């Protein structure tokens, strides 16, 4: 499975109205930090690949809106930030040409390349599988 198309990292996005209600918590916090309402949810599938410069660009953008990160970032608790949605929404708004976007409401999902779960839902459902995998190693 290639993670790039035409030299651009593949990023998935799904319209918010199609997202499970448990994940809607990420919309408001993403909107709060970015200052615009993202049309899509971007925490769709691992791995997520971003050019290194986006971290600096996003930091500058956030600090222009909220002040130095060292003053507020450590105070964020619980479900008050989704770094994957911040990165995705920022990339989609300000550097869309640097990615190959897949709108999951219009295109099929690419094949999985890693096993992933949802940590906020707990690990009980995955524990038996992990125990079996670790026992084999």
Please provide the spans of the model-predicted regions:
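A glycosyltransferase accessory/donor-loop signature
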Residues: 62-137
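Conserved catalytic core of nucleotide-sugar-dependent glycosyltransferases
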Residues: 2-75
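Alpha-helix initiation/capping motif
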Residues: 1, 51, 123-127
